[in-house]
């Protein structure tokens, strides 16, 4: 419950989702959220976020859970499971993944050195957190031999003509 509230109190657009195979856990979390919201400073923001973007979801199979997680592509994913290691190779879309019950999102925000600039709103499907690579200037170097252009050129001409870029095609 605290982890969901911790995400929800960021702003009213924060996405806060719990997925569990245990229906009784979902009920306990729902009740605990109600209790904890009475005690936090940013309760109005957290309430709005949970109301519009909060979901407590019961899914009975690990396979379906993984499918849903990869579709959601969360900014933060907490695998609060004993068998979290079996999930790791199957999760393809998440900004960061907290492993086990002690690796909570608040630790990633403030203390453990992971990146706090993460892809939001499902953009973890095609993007990663900001890294030092974003601050490197890179140059691509291309060198072709006569044999290389003769081999690759026809496909470039076809694509250029298809796109209506005659100058591109003629340059080959």
Model-derived features with residue positions:
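A short alpha-helix capping/helix-coil boundary motif
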Residues: 46, 66, 110-112
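Short amphipathic alpha-helices in soluble, non-transmembrane regions
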Residues: 32, 68-71
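ALDH superfamily catalytic-core signature
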Residues: 1-64
